[in-house]
């Protein structure tokens, strides 16, 4: 379902929907324990954010899911870099948006 969502958001949506669909697919792949594919889609999520000068809120989620995927895939050094990038973005997230980041922040800090 997440793969289908990404396919159709690429056709019908903007970069924002594509980025969020990449995030959702990375999360689904983590649930399926397909860590390598999760990392690839998390990287794509981050790439879409960078290419479109996304807000810290969007970049936070990209780097967060990338760090989580890298950790679960056993790449601790890459995870440490992505984790720090996620937390750096989180520091710049608007106060009224921080509540939406709590689950990922907790996951990054555990």
Where are these regions (language model features)?
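Amphipathic alpha-helical segments of tetratricopeptide repeats
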Residues: 2-10, 43-51, 84-95
């Amino acid at each position: 379902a997440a793969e289908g969502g990404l396919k159709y958001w690429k056709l019908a949506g903007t970069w924002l929907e594509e980025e969020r669909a990449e995030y959702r697919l990375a999360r689904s792949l983590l649930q399926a324990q397909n860590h390598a594919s999760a990392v690839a889609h998390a990287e794509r999520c981050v790439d879409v954010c960078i290419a479109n000068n996304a807000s810290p809120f969007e970049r936070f989620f990209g780097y967060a899911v990338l760090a989580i995927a890298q950790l679960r895939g056993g790449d601790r050094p890459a995870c440490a870099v992505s984790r720090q990038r996620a937390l750096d973005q989180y520091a710049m997230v608007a106060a009224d948006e921080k509540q939406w980041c709590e689950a990922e922040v907790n996951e990054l800090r555990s």
